[in-house]
């Protein structure tokens, strides 16, 4: 039997085929739509959205882009696919609902070198080793008891800071540099105790690393272009710096071992353990029953985290708190009144004296809302998942714009104003409880939340209390305005150092 082109059978058959194909195509389109990436700004060939970040503060640009593209948007940063969360709901999805799926950190080549191939806690991939490191920090290095044991170091160093400011005799001082130096000294004594080493050289090397690792680097954005490692020149410099740091830290560790073997005591104040002592005890078996390799390189990687992370975050927070109070003198007056009434002429101020300074704590909370230590939290997707119906592939970088969330008028009335009283009802916490809103994330959330909150706050509360108790403050040259420009980069630092004049409070 033959069927002609015009026969009803051929027509019906073709119709069925057309319908079947149409249904298949429609299903693929619908399926594809349900697995699309979040919306985002238009992208250029090869570089994607990189052109939109030139010369700008990244988290500010991301806030502006989110206002046009939504609270979850997609960016193409060279070869890197990234999503950006700019609302509490999206932040909660990444750090709580899908916390395990986003438990990794992005690969940063500069930090791979100086952390001994990610042996540190900050950038090590989530897994057994990382969980053991978290255990070390939570149960040994940064317990509340351990942080309190270092209080004499903080009290001595901040007392010296007051003396240094007094010696300026009313001349302009660079408070930013003084705070950084003071905090550096505290962190190094906490870590290394009484062991002598090339402190200034070591601090300079750490600062060089932070400068080389900051911002978006071509080697991270175009990982398949290996020649960029050579052209950018960063890798060679970092290996040179790591070699110098190795020599310093190996000597410090050897001296700790020798002292412990000889005296049976720690290298800290009054024979107590410093951070290196604790890590060496853990290496030798300790009390934690670890099931991971743990040697010199592991110790050095963790020391890098503590020193690099602890110094900048605390000193920057004090910098911004003083800056905001200079712009809001009524806040400074209220804080000074509380402190001076509480201390009532007391000459030596100790950490125990500041525990009930409620308004000072509100000032710090408000400072961290406007100027979070890590304005962009970085995660990486390790298991494919969906957020709001959007498909997120494995390897996608995730940025949580903490800076933008803390300034969103939908959650914060008068968000650009410095109003410590907004925290008076204890609605917001540094740690996230089960039902807590995610509008406030100065230390992150979830598995990757900062383990050093109490240590960091201790290095902010006491110096602020002392600065406000002992001195009255004014801007140099009779200025009435203060430049609050933020530095270009991923950290929330002031672009210009804070210069102030202090007069002793009689």
From Swiss-Prot:
The keyword Calcium does not apply. It is found in: Endoplasmic reticulum membrane. Keywords: Alkaloid metabolism, Endoplasmic reticulum, Heme, Iron, Membrane, Metal-binding, Monooxygenase, Oxidoreductase, Transmembrane, Transmembrane helix. Residues 27-506 are cytoplasmic. Expressed in leaf epidermis. Its cofactor is heme. Belongs to the cytochrome P450 family. It is a single-pass membrane protein. Induction: Up-regulated by herbivory. The CYP71D1V2 product is either trapped by the reductase T3R to form vindorosine and vindoline precursors, or it spontaneously rearranges to form a member of the eburnamine class of monoterpene indole alkaloids. Residues 1-5 are lumenal. Pathway: Alkaloid biosynthesis; vindoline biosynthesis. Its EC number is 1.14.14.50. The chain crosses the membrane at residues 6-26. Cytochrome P450 catalyzing the monooxygenation of 16-methoxytabersonine, 16-hydroxytabersonine and tabersonine, but not of 2,3-dihydrotabersonine. Converts the C2,C3 alkene of tabersonine and 16-methoxytabersonine to the epoxides, which then spontaneously open to form the corresponding imine alcohols. Inactive in converting amyrin to ursolic acid. InterPro entries: CYP450_71D, Cyt_P450, Cyt_P450_CS, Cyt_P450_E_grp-I, Cyt_P450_sf. GO terms for cellular component: endoplasmic reticulum membrane. This is Tabersonine 3-oxygenase. It catalyses: 16-methoxytabersonine + reduced [NADPH--hemoprotein reductase] + O2 = (3R)-1,2-didehydro-3-hydroxy-16-methoxy-2,3-dihydrotabersonine + oxidized [NADPH--hemoprotein reductase] + H2O + H(+); (-)-tabersonine + reduced [NADPH--hemoprotein reductase] + O2 = (3R)-1,2-didehydro-3-hydroxy-2,3-dihydrotabersonine + oxidized [NADPH--hemoprotein reductase] + H2O + H(+). It comes from the Eukaryota. Its main location: endoplasmic reticulum. The gene is CYP71D1V2. Heme binds at residue 450. Coiled coil: none annotated. Pfam families: p450.
């Amino acid at each position: 039997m033959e069927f002609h082109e015009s026969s009803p059978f051929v027509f019906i058959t073709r119709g069925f085929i057309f319908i079947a194909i149409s249904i298949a195509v429609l299903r693929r389109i619908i399926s594809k739509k349900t697995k699309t990436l979040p919306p985002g700004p238009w992208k250029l060939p090869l570089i994607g959205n990189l052109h939109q970040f030139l010369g700008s503060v990244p988290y500010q640009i991301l806030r502006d882009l989110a206002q046009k593209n939504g609270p979850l948007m997609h960016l193409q940063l060279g070869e890197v696919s990234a999503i950006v969360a700019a609302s509490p709901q999206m932040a909660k999805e990444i750090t709580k609902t899908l916390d395990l799926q986003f438990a990794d950190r992005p690969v940063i080549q500069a930090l791979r070198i100086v952390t001994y191939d990610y042996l540190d806690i900050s950038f090590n991939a989530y897994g057994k080793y990382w969980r053991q490191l978290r255990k070390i920090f939570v149960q040994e290095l940064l317990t509340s008891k351990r942080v309190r044991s270092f209080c004499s170091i903080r009290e001595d160093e901040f007392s010296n800071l007051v003396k240094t400011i007094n010696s300026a005799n009313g001349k302009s001082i660079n408070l930013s540099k003084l705070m950084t130096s003071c905090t550096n000294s505290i962190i190094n004594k906490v870590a290394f105790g009484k062991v002598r080493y090339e402190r200034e050289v070591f601090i300079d090397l750490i600062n060089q690393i932070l400068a080389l690792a900051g911002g978006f680097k071509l080697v991270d954005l175009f990982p398949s272009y290996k020649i960029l490692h050579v052209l950018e020149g960063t890798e060679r410099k970092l290996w040179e710096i790591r070699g110098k740091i190795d020599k310093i830290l190996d000597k410090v560790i050897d001296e700790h071992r020798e002292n412990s073997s000889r005296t049976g005591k720690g290298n800290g104040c009054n024979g107590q353990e410093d951070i290196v002592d604790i890590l060496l005890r853990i290496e030798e078996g300790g009390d934690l029953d670890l099931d991971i390799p743990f040697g010199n390189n592991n110790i050095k990687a963790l020391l890098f985290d503590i020193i690099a992370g602890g110094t900048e975050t605390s000193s920057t927070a004090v910098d911004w708190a003083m800056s905001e109070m200079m712009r809001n003198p009524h806040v400074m007056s209220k804080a000074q009144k509380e402190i001076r009434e509480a201390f009532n002429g007391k000459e030596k101020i100790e950490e125990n004296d500041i525990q009930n300074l409620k308004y000072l704590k509100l000032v710090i909370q408000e400072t961290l809302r406007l100027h979070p230590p890590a304005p962009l939290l970085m995660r990486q997707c390790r298991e494919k998942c969906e957020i709001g119906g959007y498909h997120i592939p494995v390897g996608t970088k995730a940025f949580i714009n903490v800076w933008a969330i803390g300034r969103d008028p939908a959650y914060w009335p008068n968000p650009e104003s410095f109003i410590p009283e907004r925290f008076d009802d204890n609605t917001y916490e540094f740690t996230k409880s089960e039902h807590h809103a995610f509008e406030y994330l100065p230390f992150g959330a979830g598995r990757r939340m900062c383990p050093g909150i109490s240590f960091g706050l201790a290095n902010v509360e006491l110096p602020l209390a002392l600065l406000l108790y002992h001195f009255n403050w004014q801007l140099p040259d009779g200025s009435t305005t203060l430049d609050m420009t933020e530095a270009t980069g991923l950290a929330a630092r002031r672009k210009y150092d804070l210069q102030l004049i202090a007069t002793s409070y009689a």
